[in-house]
Amino acid sequence: MIHTILPTPKKTECFEGVSILVPAIGTDHAAFEEYLPVFTGSAKRIFGLNVALAEGGIRVEYDAALPENAYRLDSREGLTLYASAKEGLLYALATALHAVKVKNGELFCEKALIEDWPEKSYRALMVDLVREWMPASRVYKYIDVCFLQKLNHLHLHFVDDQRFTLPSKAFPLLPTPEEHYTEEDIRGFCAYAKERGITLIPELEIPGHARHLNRCYPEVFANELPEGVDATIVTEEGLTISAKNIVCAGKQSAMDGIRAILQEICALFPDSPYIHLGGEEAAIKAWNYCTHCQAYMKAHGIEDEYDLYSEFIGRVTDMVFELGRTPIVWEGFPKKGSHRINRNTVVIAWESHYQLVTDLLEAGFRIINASWQPLYIVDGFELRWGPKEILEWNVYNWQHWWEHSAATLNPIHVSPTEQVLGAQICAWQTTFEQNINFVMENCTALSERLWTVKRLWNLEQYHKRHHESVRRIARLIQDR
């Protein structure tokens, strides 16, 4: 329904009455035809209605005057959607799925005129597929959530200490038995996401969170430590990180192995412009004792493990650039080492601890906001945030609950800038069943705050729209 559409369209003019619609959708613009089944398939799941691919019902028309990311919806006489490119078309189809209603088997839409486009270009959900294994069928549901709520990126955390959930021919022992995605699965994810305008972002977590790599191929990736040396570290938040969790930054075999895995990831995800490399929570103390790392540091004039950390991030991000993709890393490297990393690298600022967003912006990096508070969903964590807190936040704010974060007592705010590309919800260490309700609700609120950066509604006004919007997502992703 028009008044419950989220994210809120830029311009909406409502008129009295409704337009009764023939349950069909068609276009005479050949480039748009392949995307119309996205609407018909979604309408079947949301409304239980068969919408034909035919003329005489909803019209989809090409309008060269519209920017690629914009669309118009006109339901004054029937329902016509206008766009100039795939991006705007898919936003129009998602809006139409929110705008139409079915009653007594009849399809109709309130009479209105909508003009709409997004403000922030990066609107994302991240899902942890490692700590809790999820079958392939669940991944499709996250893609559906992104499509209907106009989030245009889905960041998939495939690799961590517990599992390696990607296929690999270069290192066949890496894929966790019975708990990894096949090449066919990945092709399915890519095709489904592409049809819906969702960019998939695969992640290879290095140099930390790499216990699985070291366990399967120690001769390739592991540090070589003297017998009896314990390089385990305990973080300020009490997290114990073993030296077994970090790859060696000194031996060539580790770098060759990382390159081989990255090449496989690029082949698996041909349409993904980004590759995420992790880059935080690493037990770099181990590098002080590793014979290969010490030799590398001496040969390259690297002063300490922190400098090596930044230099390593610089090397692996350069690999990604050489492969024709753009690297993304977590905010994990120190300010002192920023000069070692290509400024075209995108940094996700989340903790406000390793390096502050103000310093990252000053250094010239582009930023994604993943402020732990209110954008994290973590199982077993006593603090949890929902639409209320996300509405109160904005894309230029960083907050945290943790006493060691610089954003705890005094949230960090930066001036509006195009360097801040957008933001993402992060769902960690949860099963699908544990996180999906939070994902649906929080992604809806995040999309509202990124589609238009200026806040439009108070909590009561927002909730009048929120319930129906989330209900339609739930119907779209429910098992049949």
Indicate where each model-derived feature is located:
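Acidic, contiguous N-terminal accessory segments
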Residues: 1-115, 321, 326-334, 341, ...
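Feature activates predominantly on carbohydrate-active enzymes
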Residues: 2-8, 66-276, 290, 315, ...
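Soluble non-cytosolic domains of exported or imported proteins
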Residues: 33-34, 87-90, 133-137, 180, ...
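Alpha-helical structural signal in soluble globular domains
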Residues: 42, 188, 192, 196, ...
